[in-house]
Amino acid sequence: MGKIIGIDLGTTNSCVSILENGNVKVIENAEGARTTPSIIAYANDGEILVGQSAKRQAVTNPHNTLYAVKRLIGRRFDEEVVQKDIQMVPYKIVKADNNDAWVEVNGQKMAPPQISAEILKKMKKTAEDYLGEAVTEAVITVPAYFNDSQRQATKDAGRIAGLDVKRIINEPTAAALAYGMDKAKGDHTVIVYDLGGGTFDVSVIEIAEVDGEHQFEVLATNGDTFLGGEDFDIRLIDYLVDEFKKESGMNLKGDPLAMQRLKEAAEKAKIELSSSQQTDVNLPYITADATGPKHLNVKISRAKLESLVEDLVQRTIEPCRIALKDAGIDVGSINDVILVGGQTRMPLVQKTVTDFFGKEARKDVNPDEAVAMGAAIQGAVLAGDVKDVLLLDVSPLTLGIETMGGVMTALIEKNTTIPTKKSQVFSTADDNQGAVTIHVLQGERKQAAQNKSLGKFDLADIPPAPRGVPQIEVTFDIDANGILHVGAKDKATGKTQSIVIKANSGLSDEEIQQMIRDAEANSEEDRKFEELATARNQGDALVHSTRKMVADAGDKVTAEEKTAIEAAVVALEAAVKGDDKAAIDAKVEELSKVSAPVAQKMYAEQAQPAEGAAPHAESAEKADDVVDAEFEEVKDHK
């Protein structure tokens, strides 16, 4: 069996690592660098350049030089964040036939996994050159807050690059592995604050010593998959464009060549300002007009840069707060803070983290290499070369299905340790319903419509039965890569149907962030909605069971009783259509009161309960483990 390499597929830079003789080795690329720019260029002669060579020619070939493609992976074209990116990058982002965001180079449309695969190929070749043997297996890292479709797309990129992706693991978890392997014995809790080129993640991780084994358990994770060093660069680029416009009256944003030079200069200035108080951005011949060539020369102080990006740094603190709350611990319980990602070298970021957590971050973890090193350790664990490490990661968002009344019923809560498998029994909403539609959702809201739809599938050929009698078992299974598989089974017939969530149907980061923010802000609204939906379902069930009881009773019900019951039923049906929970509760009580004498009369006359009454009893009063589900009936037209 060959070596399993660890790859950090980053937004700005990528890195490859291997475990050799018990030590983790970061492998230098052909240019002698330990990290490779995540940049791909398509030359006019058809050559594909990757890494430093692509970066060097970017100024002369801006339209065909692709960078930060990871921000597009697993995303829809119409997402707001993609539309924002279109304004900022010199290359062309286009809408694919499946509505995904793709890029166009030399008239050819390409999917982000296809482009990311070129970087992975470079990483694979780097490892092969070093090892002197073929490499076919890898562990690839992704931001902890990547959703299902983004993980799937990353796996696809690996497959395109000729790699069997043995595991997708979360970047902060990988960094904790790299940090925790050589630590002294004993338990400790760490925060991994990962601010990379395009994404931000924070994870609370408990590292425990159990019978000589290092156990890494992720207690909670949070983040923002569209916040990173690229956004800091954009702020600086915008500032430089504005300064140049004030001075010359010319807008550089329409000039791809000038913008590419500005991007490089802004990135360089940002890096310099981490160690200097001031720097110059000097770009001669940036553009020209009728009066001649124009030069850009702007002095930038560290204080100026900090004022431009202060709100971006502050945006990282709320996810930290939520992660601590979800983990059920306070700041005082944190033993160490680990900074990962090149952007954490910025003094303002370090100060903000120190102020929030009340302790200095550790400096013994290389922010650019820790993630790839952790991936290599996980690769060695999977290969059986490392036996004393156990990694317990989590699913970042709640997963469930839509049930009766437009409610999202959760099957797997957020921050559940993966891999995991959960099942729940649901039933039908109508008598003789022949098929159900399973609507899979991801998000934190109680109202199904407020969450993201991941997919739908049908389970057909359910034998005719009263509503509430069929037993439909829905199973959610998240594998160790965080990828979701959903299945449904009719327990009576054994018929099953399943779905793997496809790569083009995932959540956008803004939606995820918004869901959790909304869930925090609207928890009271959600609670009221849930109570109203429960009351409506109770009212519907009572109407159904009462009408059935009256029909079964036949002439045992007097005309007066029938009239009173029908009036109460109509009143309850009207109340259920409204939004007043108290009114529904009152009408439920009223109908229960007027129908009680008939129920008592029938009970008294039935010395022996009829065997056939069992399904009715079960549909009238649901068993605790059966949830009413609003499934669509699929008509079979023959």
Curated annotation (Swiss-Prot):
The keyword Nucleotide-binding applies. It comes from the Bacteria. The keyword Transmembrane does not apply. InterPro entries: ATPase_NBD, Chaperone_DnaK, Heat_shock_70_CS, HSP70_C_sf, HSP70_peptide-bd_sf, Hsp_70_fam. Induction: By stress conditions e.g. heat shock. Residues 605-617 have a biased composition (Low complexity). The modification Phosphothreonine is found at T199. Pfam families: HSP70. Residues 605-638 are annotated as: Disordered. GO terms for molecular function: ATP binding; ATP-dependent protein folding chaperone; unfolded protein binding. Keywords: ATP-binding, Chaperone, Nucleotide-binding, Phosphoprotein, Stress response. Belongs to the heat shock protein 70 family. Acts as a chaperone. HAMAP family: DnaK (MF_00332). This is Chaperone protein DnaK. It comes from Pseudomonas fluorescens (strain ATCC BAA-477 / NRRL B-23932 / Pf-5). The lineage of its organism: Bacteria, Pseudomonadati, Pseudomonadota, Gammaproteobacteria, Pseudomonadales. The gene is dnaK.
